[in-house]
């Protein structure tokens, strides 16, 4: 019975780590678009996407000057 509980605990940990893979990919895309992950975009920045992390949900990029 103890081994069963260890297997279930391991599966729960794997399920919790699965969404983290998407977060890393979104952060990579944000860096590729020359942006950065922040909690809130500054007034001179625009939101170009999401990083989907708890602490840094937005991908921000500096606005181009015309």
UniProtKB/Swiss-Prot annotation:
Residues 1-22 form the signal peptide. Disulfide bonds join 30-59, 37-51, 41-60. It is found in: Secreted. The keyword Secreted applies. One of its GO terms (cellular component) is extracellular region. It holds the Pfam family Defensin_beta_2. Transmembrane segments: none annotated. Keywords: Antibiotic, Antimicrobial, Defensin, Disulfide bond, Secreted, Signal. One of its GO terms (biological process) is defense response to bacterium. One of its GO terms (molecular function) is lipid binding. The keyword Signal applies. InterPro entries: Beta_defensin_dom. Has antibacterial activity. Belongs to the beta-defensin family. This is Beta-defensin 13. It comes from Rattus norvegicus (Rat). The lineage of its organism: Eukaryota, Metazoa, Chordata, Craniata, Vertebrata. The gene is Defb13.
